[in-house]
């Protein structure tokens, strides 16, 4: 397990680059973390990300964004959990897990979980598993871009995570 600790008034950007278990603890007031992971799985590759974010102090902030693209017979599993402990009000935490499937044999699973043990917090999650929308491909192809180039552009844009 890889563990990250964010202390009082500290700001961290944490990049998740490989399968594994991750723990992020916000241990002091004003601690902030931006957690980003973007993955391309091909052939029979399996990507498994288990991440737990624990708010252990008041007035903390996290934004966790995981994105994946699964091709061929690959699989992607995102398990994200946010815990806001007792007496940790005024904390904000957001978890997003999104996967694009590029093959009928590719697989994905997203499991966001929230455990809120106090009041006066903002906490939310979003999860989606989808294929590339035909309307996006059609739009790019109507501008003279080949289907393969259009798919590549959409995938590149999907995996390119902005830092907030």
Task: Label each region the model flagged.
Residues 1-138, 142-145, 159-160:
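Conserved beta-strand/loop scaffold segments within soluble protein domains that form the structured core
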Residues 155-164:
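Short arginine-rich
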